[in-house]
Amino acid sequence: SLSGTYNQITQAGIELIGYRSLKAEWACLSEAGKICRTLGLTHLTLELSDAQFVPQILRTLQLNDAAADAFQTAFFAKELSTYQDLIAPLATNPLYPFLQQWPWLFGDSETIFAELKRLLPSNVITDRLAPLQQTVAFLKDQFPELRVTIDLTSRPPQSYYTGIFFHAYVDGGHQYLFSGGRYDKLLASFQQELLPAVGLAFDIDAVTDQLPNAPDQPLTFVYGLPSQWQAAAA
């Protein structure tokens, strides 16, 4: 039943299907950046995450299913006391220094990458972080005015995301202007052959809320007889 609340979102978006290359993410983000630039949406922050980062760390820790589920629940819910209890038995694991800092690994991209380089084995950096690093470098080259942050502590907004996911907002804004990511298994319910896909969607209401109000145009009144309508309308 309907609750009576306004729960509709007007969106406009981009979807690229069939491209496994990281350039698909770049193409979507580039178009979104150009749109924001054209609309004069400045002071924009783009936050990047990776849907596979948490699963890879859990595989590296070799936790059983029950322990992995408890770990993810506490981690994503920011239940830090429970999280600390769960990582305590891993004190001798090489990843333990990373696990201690993990809940706070979000913020400026350069700072986060420096911390990860210090805390993680090089193979993890290469496997999962290289696409994020390359994407940050691309964005800073194409959109130097853009603030790019990394968040490796957030749950993907949809379970079907399989790689990089992202959202953008302006300083002081309460809504995402656009969001999206890679979802290579979304079409699994409709066909046997999986197609890689990347997409993003703009929240039209959030975008229009950030646009400057158009200046009032002066009204011009033209008086005339009905027979003079065409001349008056011209």
Predicted segments, located by residue:
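Acidic, His- and aromatic-enriched active-site or binding-groove loops in soluble protein domains
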Residues: Q62-A88, V170
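Intrinsic-disorder-associated interaction segments
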Residues: E47, N64, F76, L105-S109
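Short, conserved phosphate-binding/catalytic loop or strand-edge motifs used
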Residues: Q8-A12, L48-Q56
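Short, solvent-exposed helix-helix connector turns and helix-capping sites enriched
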Residues: D50, K78-T82, D108, Q228
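Short internal beta-strands
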Residues: T45-S49, Y223
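A short alpha->loop->secondary-structure connector
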Residues: L39-H43, N64-D65
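A short acidic (Asp/Glu
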Residues: P55-R59, Y161
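Positively charged, Gly/Ser-enriched RNA/tRNA-binding surfaces
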Residues: S1-L41, I87-A234
